[in-house]
Amino acid sequence: GLNIEKNKIIVSGFSAGGHLAASLGVFWNTEELAGITGMENERIRPNGMILNYPVITSGVAGHEESFRNLLGDRYEELKDRMSLEFQVTEDTPRTFIWHTFEDQTVLLDNTLLFVQALYKKGIPVEYHVFPQGPHGIGLANELTANENGRGIARACEPWSELAGKWLNREFPWWNGAKIER
């Protein structure tokens, strides 16, 4: 086994990876996922999600290329099912989510739709929208910037500290590991 403590799972993802993490959050208790993984649903249930400018919707504001890559020939058949704002239930885990106002690749509407769906189901969510910042940034500082400086977005830099505080507050078992700057 992987020695994973089933009650201590936090999933995270950026952009299309955010869609993957959020998919686990909304589909963890489905028979379909249990069949795919061969595991009991409770063993794969995330306790929380950290979603970083995630692809969420195949709707008007969706990132169609991501959905076409994900669904291939079954795009028309599955695009609504994989629009995660429609899949949130009372069993979806609490969520930390952030985005940037300037993101022109995955539009802000994606997180707005997901946060609204979480709110309507009574799922606790911490949501941050930073005024500046391109798509595809990591820690938004020199640690994750590429060699020509792309990836530095000072307005977004607080996201990792905010996420750490959220983890410590929401999950008492969290070890409080800090990312060195």
Predicted regions and their residues:
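Hydrophobic anchor at the start of a short beta-strand
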Residues: 9, 95, 125
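C-terminal catalytic histidine-bearing segment of alpha/beta-hydrolase fold enzymes
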Residues: 112-181
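Hydrophobic/aromatic beta-strand patches that form the interior of the parallel beta-sheet core
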Residues: 50, 96-98, 128
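Short beta-strand/loop motif that positions the catalytic acidic residue
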Residues: 91, 96-99, 103
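Conserved serine/cysteine hydrolase catalytic core
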Residues: 84-92
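Conserved alpha/beta-hydrolase "acid-adjacent" motif
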Residues: 104-113
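Acidic beta-to-alpha connecting loop that harbors the catalytic carboxylate
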Residues: 101-104, 132-134
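Primarily recognizes the serine-hydrolase "nucleophile elbow" in alpha/beta-hydrolase
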Residues: 1-65, 75, 79-80, 84, ...
